[in-house]
């Protein structure tokens, strides 16, 4: 009876008469009863059987591919921790940023090393007083060579001093100064035009090799065996020249040695450059910025010295 009153009350005026005139007859819609209170719902009392139909299965808020059934085995124990999804979605981008920062750090250190070496070479080349002094005192050359060798072994073989600040920068500074002295003394025996010419050739070659190493798809880091064989060939060729030099100077043999040395260290420059990139077979850790700068610096210095032996003219 109550439902009939509610049904009549909810109709618009004149609707009932129009339906009777047309001979239509409709059943009044059933109005659901009020929902149970919280106490009744939790205690199970006051509910009549069949009063409320069973609701449909809850639909997950995420799509089916993103939904994980807690009762199923996902293959990972304990599931993903909080923030793990964000780590995977940004890992490659963060790794690329770290690699770019590493490359900038290496080339910043390398630029400082090359500027210091260039200043020492210019001092030993243009200043006659300094040039005469270093040539008259070869003991400083051998002392610098000993310091260079000791610091190079320390930085190349000991990861502790190489990775810990400030010892890594202190050792690298000593290494750079000793190598700059050796390069400057070698340059003092050649005329100014030869030194400037070799500096320009070295700059062009190193810049071209660096750009090529970054752009090419060829992986130089996978050719370390070939580079080792070439390095051993260069070593034994230099040993042979050292044995023959006191007896007789062979110009063509010395020229072949200089060409071989410049070619080998040009390949090593490409190899060490690609070690910085991180998308090759072998790559340096971002912690090894000192080691990366050390290798490329040595490659450039050796290329310059071999060009100096090949194109340089001795002072009169």
Swiss-Prot record:
Signal peptide: none annotated. Residues 1-49 are annotated as: Disordered. This is Protein lifeguard 2. The lineage of its organism: Eukaryota, Metazoa, Chordata, Craniata, Vertebrata. Glycans are attached at residue 191. Pfam families: Bax1-I (PF01027). It is a multi-pass membrane protein. The chain crosses the membrane at residues 106-126, 138-158, 165-185, 194-214, 225-245, 251-271, 290-310. Belongs to the BI1 family. LFG subfamily. One of its GO terms (biological process) is negative regulation of extrinsic apoptotic signaling pathway via death domain receptors. The keyword Repressor does not apply. Interacts with FAS/TNFRSF6 and BAX. It comes from Rattus norvegicus. One of its GO terms (molecular function) is calcium channel activity. Expressed at high levels on dendrites and to a lesser extent on the soma and axons of neurons in various regions of brain.
């Amino acid at each position: 009876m109550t439902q009939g009153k509610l049904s009549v009350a909810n109709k618009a005026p004149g609707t009932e008469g129009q339906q009777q005139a047309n001979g239509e007859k409709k059943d009044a819609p059933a109005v659901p009863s009020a929902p149970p209170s919280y106490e009744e719902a939790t205690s199970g009392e006051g509910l009549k059987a069949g009063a409320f139909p069973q609701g449909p299965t809850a639909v997950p808020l995420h799509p089916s591919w993103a939904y994980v059934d807690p009762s199923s085995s996902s293959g990972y124990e304990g599931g993903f921790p909080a923030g793990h999804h964000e780590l995977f979605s940004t890992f490659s981008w963060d790794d690329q940023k770290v690699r770019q920062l590493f490359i900038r750090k290496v080339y910043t250190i390398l630029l400082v090393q090359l500027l210091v070496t260039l200043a020492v070479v210019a001092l030993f080349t243009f200043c006659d007083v300094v040039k005469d002094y270093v040539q008259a005192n070869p003991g400083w050359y051998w002392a610098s060579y000993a310091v260079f060798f000791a610091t190079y072994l320390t930085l190349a073989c000991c990861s502790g001093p190489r990775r810990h600040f400030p010892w890594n920068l202190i050792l690298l500074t000593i290494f750079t100064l000793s190598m700059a002295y050796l390069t400057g003394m070698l340059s003092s025996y050649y005329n100014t035009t030869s030194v400037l010419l070799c500096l320009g050739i070295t700059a062009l070659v190193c810049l071209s090799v660096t750009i090529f190493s970054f752009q090419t798809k060829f992986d130089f880091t996978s050719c370390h065996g070939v580079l080792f064989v070439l390095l051993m060939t260069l070593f034994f060729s230099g040993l042979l020249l050292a044995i023959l030099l006191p007896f007789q100077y062979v110009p063509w043999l010395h020229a072949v040695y200089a060409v071989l040395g410049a070619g080998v260290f040009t390949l090593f420059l490409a190899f060490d450059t690609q070690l910085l990139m991180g998308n090759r077979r072998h790559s340096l850790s971002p912690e090894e910025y000192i080691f990366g700068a050390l290798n490329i610096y040595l490659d450039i210095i050796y290329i310059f010295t071999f060009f100096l032996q090949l194109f340089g003219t001795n002072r009169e």
